[in-house]
């Protein structure tokens, strides 16, 4: 589970004399770029991230929000929030989790293959007065949970971690705990690179390996907007906009491209420089390590070198993201 903390504690790193100096990832809550793009480009990508979508843009038919910012806004666009989504399901006779069958339109259609229950729908409406597609949870679905919106700040550095780095985390964790805690690095499809896989690191279940895959998945499932990577609607009821909804603009980029570039350019969460020097904070840091919190919530990671191809060869790590040390205090593995 990829949980990037809302703030980051920077540790003093004792480097061996022969090791090359590590470059710290830019951190802050000022909404500026981490150096990946210039200010005008970052502002343009931010505008796309904050844009409120309408039905004419492809919003729905089922959706949770009308913009990325609606769920990712604290303390700046790209941050976390207390906005949550509902996931449900049930266990079969063998105890395995199964997704629900959700009936809509008075039983005329069944939505299968996903645990997400969308909060909103675009109909009934003036155009479709008798079509009822709002999702409701059947009594059969006993497994229910709310998941809050995750922080996106610093995710460009998370994407730039090598798969091997995350595999090594899993091995080291299991070794250090003598088999008591053995998180998994899960390989998942890279949607923009058919046939290729990478270690998942985005989403509550590490279900996405790249920020472009993540953008397309969220655009469809949270806003109901299709794209070249996710061209199929969850339901076509009440749908009057051609697919894919997300079409390239004058610059040749689709919204999902702008979203991915925006997230890649976000600074890492900043440390509270004053608070970190207090006796209480220093004592807490010692306890965090001593009781084993750091076993899962990793304090310091370093991205792959610039020039490294990732995401099935569809993205090459630029200088702004390559060879950068950051301090996520996050758990990047799946746990049973």
PLM-predicted stretches and their roles:
Residues 6-16:
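Bacterial N-terminal signal peptides
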Residues 17-336:
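Periplasmic c-type cytochrome electron-transfer domains
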Residues 1-4:
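Positively charged n-region of N-terminal signal peptides that target proteins for export
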């Amino acid at each position: 589970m990829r949980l990037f903390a809302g703030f980051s504690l920077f540790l003093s790193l004792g480097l061996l004399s022969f090791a090359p100096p590590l470059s710290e990832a830019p951190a802050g809550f000022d909404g500026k770029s981490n150096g990946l793009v210039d200010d005008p480009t970052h502002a343009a990508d931010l505008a796309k991230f904050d844009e409120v979508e309408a039905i004419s843009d492809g919003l729905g038919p089922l959706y949770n929000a009308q913009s990325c910012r609606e769920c990712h806004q604290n303390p700046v666009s790209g941050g976390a929030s207390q906005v949550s989504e509902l996931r449900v399901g049930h266990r079969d006779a063998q105890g395995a989790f199964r997704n629900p069958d959700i009936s809509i339109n008075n039983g005329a259609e069944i939505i299968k293959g996903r645990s997400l229950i969308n909060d909103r729908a675009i109909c009934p409406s003036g155009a479709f007065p008798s079509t009822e597609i709002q999702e409701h949870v059947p009594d059969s679905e006993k497994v229910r949970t709310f998941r809050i919106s995750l922080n996106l700040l610093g995710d460009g550095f998370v994407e730039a971690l090598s798969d091997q780095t995350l595999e090594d985390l899993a091995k080291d964790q299991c070794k250090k705990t003598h088999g008591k805690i053995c998180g998994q690095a899960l390989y998942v499809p890279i949607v923009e690179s058919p046939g290729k896989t990478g270690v998942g690191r985005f989403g509550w279940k590490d279900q996405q390996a790249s920020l472009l895959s993540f953008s397309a998945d969220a655009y469809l499932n949270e806003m109901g907007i299709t794209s070249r990577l996710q061209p199929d609607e969850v339901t076509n009821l009440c749908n009057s906009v051609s697919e894919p909804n997300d079409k390239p603009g004058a610059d040749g980029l689709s919204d999902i491209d702008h979203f991915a570039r925006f997230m890649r350019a976000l600074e890492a969460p900043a440390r509270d420089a004053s608070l970190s020097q207090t006796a209480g904070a220093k004592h807490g840091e010692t306890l965090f390590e001593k009781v084993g919190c750091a076993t899962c919530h990793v304090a310091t990671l370093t991205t792959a070198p610039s020039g490294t191809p990732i995401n099935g060869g569809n993205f090459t790590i630029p200088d702004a993201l390559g060879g950068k040390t950051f301090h996520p205090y996050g758990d990047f593995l799946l746990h049973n």
